[in-house]
Structures are given as structure tokens and as C-alpha cells.
From Swiss-Prot:
Its cofactor is FMN. GO terms for molecular function: electron transfer activity; FMN binding; oxidoreductase activity, acting on NAD(P)H as acceptor; oxidoreductase activity, acting on NAD(P)H, quinone or similar compound as acceptor. It comes from the Bacteria. It comes from Sinorhizobium fredii (strain NBRC 101917 / NGR234). PANTHER family: FMN-DEPENDENT NADH-AZOREDUCTASE 1 (PTHR43741), FMN-DEPENDENT NADH:QUINONE OXIDOREDUCTASE (PTHR43741:SF4). The keyword Transcription regulation does not apply. This is FMN-dependent NADH:quinone oxidoreductase.
Amino acid sequence: MNVLHIDSGILGEHSVSRRLTAAIVAQIKADRPDANVIYRDLVSERLQHLTGAQIMAPADLDGVDPALASDVRTGRQMLDEFLAADTIVVGAPMYNFSIPSQLKAWIDRLAVAGKTFRYTEAGPEGLAKGKKVIVASTRGGHYSAGPAAAMDHQEAYLRTVFGFFGITDVEFVRAEGLNLGADQKQFAIAEAEKTIAEGDVLRLAS
């Protein structure tokens, strides 16, 4: 089984989303010692945001500007990693009601017609069916219910874009209210880690 582990939290060792994705992957490895894990830290790797030059780059990169060619190859490799994965673990903190720009840059490299989706007479069709996505979702406030739920452009976006790719099995391990005091932060992390340890969310694609 192939597992793709993605981190996008910018707080390094202080990042709760990184703590949770590490726990998820550790649980997967405990349950499936044969799992092959590929790790991408989208912050330290400094993936470039999408440009017109990237989109227009030819399939054959011979003669292309070396910096552009390197960037395009990186994007293609990330797409290949995604397509090869059975389970994708994504650390996705909420920043300003949405996802980190680093994570959006990664998703932009995945959204390739003919690879993760295609257009048909009946409408778009996802081509990445059969995968499982587990998202470690962290938020400073509470956005899963109540009036603030309308501000959620994080989980809603991720469910939509992975669904567009054909992935219907998307689970969220959520830690909310992390900026509402030490007790609430400790409680939210403990509840998320309990969810991971109980394993229901980790019923994996194989």
C-alpha cells in the first residue's frame, strides 16, 4: 500500500496539524507495516505557485529554461506521487478561513485534465477514484457548526476539489478552538488524537 503524507503548516514544531498527521501516519504504519510512505513538506520544499509558463510548458522540456524545467518536473513528480498513492494524509490548518497557499500550490499541480479529471458530454469526471484522503484539520476558532460555519473555505474546499478528482472517501480529523485558551487547545488535541487512536477514520484504501 502506498501512502502520501503531506504537511503544509507553517509553524514547524509548534504546528498541531503536523503533530496530527504524524500520529495518523504512525497509526497507519502500526496497522500496515508494509505501507510505503512518501513525505512532502510543502513549506520547506518551497513549491512555486502556478504560473502561465508552467501551464504552457511542452511535454518535452529539452531547451526549456532550466529553472522552469526543474519546477515543471517537480510538479509532474508530485502528480505521479498522488496518482500512485492509495491513501493520502494531508495536514491542512485553516489560515484566514481557507487553506495554506502552499497546499493550494500543491493542489494546483494535481488538477491536470486527463490525469485527475476529464471533461465528458455528461460533465466533468474524476479520474482518481478509489483513493482515501485523511485530512488533519486544525482551526483557531470553531467553524464546524453555527454561524461561523459559513466562513469555512477550508474543509469545504478540500472535500470539493478531491471530489472533483473522483475521491469520495475523504475523512477529517479535526482540532478546533486552538486559539481559545490553553485548556481548550489541550482538549481539542486530545480529542483528535483519541479519534486517531480509535482507528475508525483510518479504514484505509488498499
